[in-house]
Amino acid sequence: MSLVTLQDIFQLGYPEYACTHPLPAHVRKAARAIMHGRTAVLGGHVHACPDGHISRIWYNACRHRSCPQCAFLQVERWLATQRARLLACAHSQVILTLPHDLHPLWREPVPRMTALVFQTVRDTLTTLLAEPTYLGAPPGIIAALHTWGQTLGLHPPLHGLVTGGGWTADGQWKAVRHGLLVPGRVAMALFRGTGLAALRTAWPRDALQLPEDLRPQAFLTRLHRLGHPQQTRWHVHRQERSPHGTGVATSLARSMRGGPLKNPRLVAWDGETVTFRYMENPTQAAEASGRQQQRTLPIGDFLQRVLQHVPPPGTQVVRSWGLSHARHADALPVCRTQLDQPPVVLPVRLDWQTVCAQRGDAHPAQCPLCGQLLVCTMVLPRGGVSPPASSPERAA
């Protein structure tokens, strides 16, 4: 288990980085959250055994979606709700990735490009699956976008969880008749055409802002080149169908919150450089085992890579369509009945103590000696002094 944490690196490396790099307000807010989450700065509570056996201090979470140690509760709550709603049918994961030539557009207002990508993927999947040749009915789709690759560079794939069937116009559940829900070459061609059409429509309407170093004529030339499949590929990766959607839903949940790098992937840092693990080819799970690599970056480059993935306020990175959308709430119970499933029973809102217990840890709110629940004896105000971060030598 790694001893170094992202919080350690930020506490010791971010203040100097912030002095020399102008950062947007939402990025500075994220950095402060990563540094202060579950420390005395945010206040906390003292809990003690009624019989005086032990007492514990629990500091408050920052609840920022880019913080890897404070986002787990929101992830587990979302995942519990989705598990309760999943249909008892096969599911497929589809990963759609824009060409690298479009990456500069992400440097401008991120919400605009995010909306355009979701629109493109929605139109691609719903149009394709509406064809009787492939399904002929709207399925349930949950899509999640994250903007990073394994080495923390800009790589914005959109992951979609698609049900292996859909809801027909005459009110019947229709299952996929063959193994491939989305045919690869057809999906790539439609993805390319839909994406280029969306870009050409958005730019004249000022719904898309070009970078300063990309002239309009150069942008149009780039779009023309992106329309040739021999020159540029619009990747559509289809993973093997799963008999249920729990595994893919869990993967989507992990990418929703917590930022691009979780603490277990950190290897070491010495105050000047950070070393972390990455998977060479994560989309090929069977081949990826044993292909774990390590990369070392200067602290400035590392912080820049992490912070570039902080989404601006209001950016929605998870969306639902078809049977998974709220507008089809009336159809979902009928589908469950036809699939011999009971009605949806939403879970009780999870608290962090329950989540810790579900992970197999000792229940944090129970006294390890007598088993009684700990009671709150003191509230610690915000603004306390956080303990110093681990030194680089100790963290390594």
Specify the residue positions occupied by each region the protein language model found:
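Beta->alpha loop/short-helix hinge microenvironment recognizer with preference
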Residues: 1-396
